[in-house]
């Protein structure tokens, strides 16, 4: 039997009239739908059971045949086939048109496909199709020309003159006849010859025509099929009609549109039978043409057909388009069974891989499993009985439910699903109530809080789905974020606060200086009240023999606090003792200074290093570092345990600490009043100078803003110096649990300057703080900023979501396809430094997790640090940086040779697992999510670099990222040099308000004009290279690629993307930006086709271009030449090889029109196109190499036991046998 789900590709084409008839199960002749009294479909109508199949399963319309046993019989009385009613979703009908009509997509699209084939302008076409003019089809021996347009009067005149010696017609029939006459081969040859001489607009049009004629020739579609003689009628269940209460009917708009077509068609038939006058027939034909236009794409031409309440009717095109269309609503995202949603609540007692599911919800979700188990155990006699027990919620079902949910993970998802960590698997635990329970550490990945957030739950049903959920999606595996490889499960709030308080030290606490032989002894002393968590004590290192204490310290006494001793009990036994929050202590034994020297008194040691302990409680960032380090050393299982222990410890310690906030905890500032008085004095001074005309209004404004900003900074400085380890607010802020210095300043100092609705700053600051309370005016001023903040956030979310969608669409088919593409190319990695922003990304960051492409040697000694083809880990990268190496050749995604994807060696390490990436990993989607997800954290504004002459508006944040990936002309564009050379002179031309920079190259000299106000970025005598900036600003990648090469442009885009993210505090891995940059530069534009069959100016994939050239070179011809072509992500997503993916993205009708004319073949390589047609996606476990592995079971018992040598000989013999066959 054929596997319906196994096909290589999917093709689209134009349907010929005969093809439409072959799909059809019968002609729809009447506009009737269903009989309003009997509610039965009318005969020959739009819902006819004879055409479309029975409305009831296995029952004909008249009731003569009922039941499965009559399957396949056609009733002799009513003519309905006995089969399932499901066929009403599949069977099509057709309408035989009395006159041909054009298909609006091919006539009205831009460019008009019919117009190009016939070489007639769209305006003229419209006149002919809608019966405003005649077109000459065959001029005969008259003086007329073919395709000449004649008005009614001219036609009569010519007819009187020449009689029947020429043929001219109107309407779609004329267009059909002309299209039939087109000889594609002849036209293509003629056009190719013409192209040699044509220039400008004519050449562009000729290339367009050639492209479309070539498409028809190669696809096997005939041009006349763009004119329809029959209209297909889609299955009735896809355009349903349902009865509402009160006897009225709700129907799909398509039925109304079909009825219009049928009515007009029937009227036209009648008029033709009656031999009505030509004018009346023409009018009816025009109305039929308009009815079919409205059916296919209502509103494309003229005013749309409206239904009740002046609402435009939804045509077939509208059914496909947009978010509510068939593609995005029903094919890419479906509603699924075995799912639920509820409010979430926190549950600190859960393990990291667990979630709480309310009992009633679990019972409903796992109902079939519970029913089966009830029957299996004999608690219920059959399934019906089991269902009844569940509905009644009998006592004996709960044990069965507990048993059933063991080993069956569920998926939890929170919208918006910004990245793959927004869906994770958990093992369900039954909980009372109605809320889903979530582990506190899972919140970060979901960006969830418990102020009313809701989450959806899904049950994986098949064994494969369960296995994937457990092995790949379980929350315990998602410790690192794919964005940059850092832990995403960093503790927050109470957990941070508790562990910070636990690891604090205090001089002079009870029991200070006590020495304990083992940690257990210290615990007894704590329980007896002899010591406190913050007490500094001594402990014998010998009590923890598995730890690495460093040379000679195995039997020493070390100084620590009891709290830190307890904290260290969370770590594995063989991990270092962490006594101070430093990177050194995480990677090597504790510093020597904490050990007692022989004979040294512990009190002396405390006097010496006590302050070091006091100054170093463990903050939030350090807790994250410990998770990272434990993950690197011990992997998933142990890290998951550590996280749960850390959570328990944090909650327990913050409970014991009893930290709370009161008004009294907000400190008073001593200097604020004096600082404010001084600022007011300075403001008065500035105003005075302005009144005397010594300052412009802008200078006055800027000065006042600066005075108040300085004042607020001084107040903030005083508050920042307030570090009281006993003050709860201070402890919360310093530990990283909640709040930052700015919040603290607003509580205790002053709020400072506020923004106006336009984004400027008010000159009057808010002097009060929240402890004192604001005046009415101050409160009013604050509201502008608050509202603007809310609006900005809402806008940013939408912008960022749309960016993510475009990124995913362009990168979704980038999958790791092979182990090594074998390229010897790579990129030179060096630190990314910006003139203004300083260091953007260090060399170390760029090396970790990448493969070397050349051997790396020490610049001083010349010894090999790392050989070629090695995956660099943190230690190796640090070693390279420490050796003083400035540049390293690495394998890169930008230079990978794998087609339709990337190889493992060019990608390097998978950031989410810290291992080398696996074949099948969907790295494109991950890259798109990693760039899109932090989009909401970037700013939305275009900053104006204040008052500097010549400084343009520089775009930053989200708009800048969009500008780069969409390849738009950047704001504040920099002029770049097109030659290598020296800056000869810089001159100002005051008369023309210009400056001129002369660059002297080796071959020619170039003069660049720049604005008079711009400040040149070069000086006379500077040596510069192609692509270097002459004035500050953003380089346009399209210009850069013309003067340099693809790789330089890609590296520029990469550096700029990193600048946008890292300056906003978002660490993004290079490889994600590389994946998308590669996608934007996948195409080339053909300059000279040589002896290939490519068209000049055609834009095509680099891989396809190489293949076409290879074929020509092999046969000894002249290859084509092309230049790199940069496409924005939207364009690139629409230009993809998959028409399904492009059509479901944007401009659905345009994509489908083009694809059908070209007879496009979708190779189904990406993810979206496979989701659309319901196939398993070709990534991850859906990769053919994983799917096609069939576990072999040897059923035959061996006659005797073979040795290895026997087996090898047997296999050799079998191979020879098959070869001889």
Curated annotation (Swiss-Prot):
Pfam families: RNA_pol_Rpb1_1, RNA_pol_Rpb1_2, RNA_pol_Rpb1_3, RNA_pol_Rpb1_4, RNA_pol_Rpb1_5. Transmembrane segments: none annotated. Its cofactor is Mg(2+); Zn(2+). Zn(2+) 2 binds at residues 821, 896, 903, 906. It catalyses: RNA(n) + a ribonucleoside 5'-triphosphate = RNA(n+1) + diphosphate. Gene3D superfamilies: 1.10.132.30, 1.10.150.390, 1.10.1790.20, 1.10.40.90, 2.40.40.20, 2.40.50.100, RNA polymerase II, clamp domain, RNA polymerase Rpb1, domain 3. Signal peptide: none annotated. GO terms for biological process: DNA-templated transcription. Keywords: DNA-directed RNA polymerase, Magnesium, Metal-binding, Nucleotidyltransferase, Transcription, Transferase, Zinc. The RNAP catalytic core consists of 2 alpha, 1 beta, 1 beta' and 1 omega subunit. When a sigma factor is associated with the core the holoenzyme is formed, which can initiate transcription. HAMAP family: RNApol_bact_RpoC (MF_01322). Belongs to the RNA polymerase beta' chain family. DNA-dependent RNA polymerase catalyzes the transcription of DNA into RNA using the four ribonucleoside triphosphates as substrates. This is DNA-directed RNA polymerase subunit beta'. It comes from Lactobacillus delbrueckii subsp. bulgaricus (strain ATCC BAA-365 / Lb-18). The lineage of its organism: Bacteria, Bacillati, Bacillota, Bacilli, Lactobacillales.
